[in-house]
């Protein structure tokens, strides 16, 4: 069923669906399928690609990254596919919902990942150019510092800034999406609070290191 102008009830269902899509724990699923330990049992205990990489299995980490990013993109793509006339407010709520699904998934007792890959996925849905600018920022900081968390924080801070300044020229600009992206950025900082503390104390693990 495709609705050009979705009813409030259908829009609400799309938001719930986005949350459930976000709940798919790719780090746990990929690790189980590949015979690896549950990522919640080692390293940072975070079910995300960076922690999976600590096993030394780059394929598992890459699949986790792709899966977590894809669900962010897919939730927004599906919402517009089912309801092309979805309002900008509805779109912004779907964006936040899939992100919250990853952070607080019912499938893992509301204890999910930190959201970097899923945030990347929603940025690709908003605009591939916006996502590429954010990825370039992450790569630059990561290569220079070898801190994945610091790279994520810098990219998270700048993504809404990029959206605002490029809006209306490179990609469409609207207030609900801008607010949603600011919300995603704030949540990323909140989820990285422990990393921020370790960065300040000089105890944060660098990319490629193994944490027992």
From Swiss-Prot:
InterPro entries: G3P_acylTferase_PlsY (IPR003811)
Catalytic activity: an acyl phosphate + sn-glycerol 3-phosphate = a 1-acyl-sn-glycero-3-phosphate + phosphate
Gene Ontology BP annotations: phospholipid biosynthetic process
Metabolic or biological pathway, per its Swiss-Prot or TrEMBL entry: Lipid metabolism; phospholipid metabolism
Localization: Cell inner membrane
Enzyme Commission designation: 2.3.1.275
A molecular function GO annotation: acyl-phosphate glycerol-3-phosphate acyltransferase activity
Annotated transmembrane regions: 10-30, 90-110, 124-144, 150-170, 171-191
Topology of this chain in the membrane: Multi-pass membrane protein
Keywords: Cell inner membrane, Cell membrane, Lipid biosynthesis, Lipid metabolism, Membrane, Phospholipid biosynthesis, Phospholipid metabolism, Transferase, Transmembrane, Transmembrane helix
GO cellular component assignments: plasma membrane
Top-level taxon of the source organism: Bacteria
Keyword Transferase recorded: yes
Record family assignment: Belongs to the PlsY family.
UniProt xrefs under NCBIfam families: glycerol-3-phosphate 1-O-acyltransferase PlsY
Role description: Catalyzes the transfer of an acyl group from acyl-phosphate (acyl-PO(4)) to glycerol-3-phosphate (G3P) to form lysophosphatidic acid (LPA). This enzyme utilizes acyl-phosphate as fatty acyl donor, but not acyl-CoA or acyl-ACP.
Assembly description: Probably interacts with PlsX.
PANTHER family assigned: GLYCEROL-3-PHOSPHATE ACYLTRANSFERASE-RELATED, INNER MEMBRANE PROTEIN YGIH
The protein's name: Glycerol-3-phosphate acyltransferase
Lineage: Bacteria, Pseudomonadati, Pseudomonadota, Betaproteobacteria, Burkholderiales
């Amino acid at each position: 069923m495709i609705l050009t102008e979705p009813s409030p009830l259908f829009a609400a269902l799309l938001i719930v669906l986005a949350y459930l899509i976000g709940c798919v724990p790719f780090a746990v699923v990929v690790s189980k399928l590949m015979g690896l330990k549950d990522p919640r049992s080692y390293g940072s205990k975070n079910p995300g690609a960076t922690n999976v990489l600590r096993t030394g299995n780059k394929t598992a980490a890459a699949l986790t990254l792709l899966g977590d990013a894809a669900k962010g993109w897919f939730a927004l793509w599906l919402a517009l596919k089912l309801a092309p006339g979805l309002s900008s407010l509805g779109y912004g709520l779907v964006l936040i919902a899939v992100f919250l699904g990853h952070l607080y998934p019912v499938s893992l007792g509301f204890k999910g990942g930190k959201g970097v890959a899923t945030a990347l996925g929603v940025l690709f849905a908003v605009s591939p150019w916006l996502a590429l600018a954010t990825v370039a920022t992450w790569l630059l900081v990561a290569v220079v510092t070898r801190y994945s968390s610091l790279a994520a924080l810098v990219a998270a801070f700048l993504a809404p800034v990029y959206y605002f300044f490029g809006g209306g020229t490179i990609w469409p600009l609207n207030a609900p999406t801008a607010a949603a992206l600011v919300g995603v950025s704030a949540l990323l900082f909140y989820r990285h609070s422990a990393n921020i503390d370790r960065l300040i104390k000089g105890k944060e693990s660098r990319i490629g290191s193994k944490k027992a």
